[in-house]
Amino acid sequence: MKILLIDDHKLFSQSIKMILELSENIKKVQLVDNFSTISEIAFNDYDIILIDINLTSLYQADGLTLAQEIIDNGCSSKVVILTGYSKKMYEHRAKAMGAYGFLDKSMNPDELVKKLEK
């Protein structure tokens, strides 16, 4: 499985990458902290795109807006929202737009890997 992680917090991203790469089922984890067009993301060959809701320094809008644009551009990857914010506040919007999942950043690392491997 190939995963793209879009998050503007480098320390968090690097930690998650190290955890995910310990899984036998995850072959590649690519970190994105800079991009200029949606097509750079949407049309690469990833199984899952993990997107943080708060992308202040990366993108002109929030992660949900970026996720919606990726989905609307016909990306075949599963888009999963990753957040440290209240689930109730954003989960309904994420599901309504077609996101595959919604995960909490404070989740146990083993649980995160299990959910992504489903």
What are these regions (language model features)?
Residues L31-I48:
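Acidic, metal-coordinating helix/loop segments flanking the phosphotransfer/catalytic sites
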Residues D52-N54:
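Active-site residues of response regulator receiver
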Residues A61-S76:
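Short amphipathic alpha-helix used as the core "switch/output" element in two-component signaling
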Residues D7:
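Conserved acidic carboxylate
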Residues A61, S86-L103:
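Alpha4 helix (beta4-alpha4-beta5 surface) of REC/receiver domains from two-component response regulators
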